[in-house]
Amino acid sequence: MKITKIEKKKRLYTLELDNTENLYITEDTIVHFMLSKGMIVNAEKLENIKKFAQLSYGKNLGLYYISFKQRTEKELIKYLQQHDIDSKIIPQIIDNLKSENWINDKNYVQSFIQQNLNTGDKGPYVIKQKLLQKGIKSKIIESELQAINFQDLASKISQKLYKKYQNKLPLKALKDKLMQSLTTKGFDYQIAHTVIQNLEIEKDQELEEDLIYKELDKQYQKFSKKYDQYELKQRIINALMRKGYQYEDIKSALREYL
């Protein structure tokens, strides 16, 4: 078979043979096999050209995908599959890119954690789940997470949350809210408990009284038309306790309110 034409088409080249067969190949393929118009190729060489072209094209696709931002091995495999790269050569493409350090799940984890420490608000448990979803092995994630002390980040977040809720919630509800928020973000109970204790939050009696009477007004309006005196009182007490107010404070406020 003779090569009758090699023509550039955007990022690829078309290679035409005198047996009417056309191939899409990369520039690397042309260089590797030193292809030129008029060259004679046998069936074995043609098959090698096809395999190399597919491998080269897949690698170029991978490099293009990686050029926008860091990717995990799983993300890259999915991208290559979506672009119809032969599943048999994808492992070879991945190995090639890994050997040149274009993809490195350990480095990805390190960058992900560092970015979270700099600008994020997630603790290790949430970070681990996010990285697992990206196809990274658990042992790689855990190894990197164990090297990080998340207490400083938890402390910074607890201070922000405290400023947000300090004049809106009674002491118990405030501490519960901080604990719930920190654990939901992926920090373990011990770290959350420690940073909340370090805030040294004290009860503001004047604020608590103001908040409890505002809540009494709200709950009274809600229940007063539905329940009599005893049932009304119990409904209000239960509602306020669920919101973090202390039983004795509620009883004291009710004596003046009702």
Swiss-Prot record:
Top-rank taxon: Bacteria
Subcellular location: Cytoplasm
Keyword Cytoplasm in record: yes
Chief place of localization: cytoplasm
Entry-linked InterPro entries: RecX_HTH_1st, RecX_HTH_2nd, RecX_HTH_3rd, Regulatory_RecX, WH-like_DNA-bd_sf
UniProt family annotation: Belongs to the RecX family.
Family matches, as HAMAP family: RecX (MF_01114)
Function noted in UniProt: Modulates RecA activity.
Protein name: Regulatory protein RecX
Protein source organism: Streptococcus agalactiae serotype Ia (strain ATCC 27591 / A909 / CDC SS700)
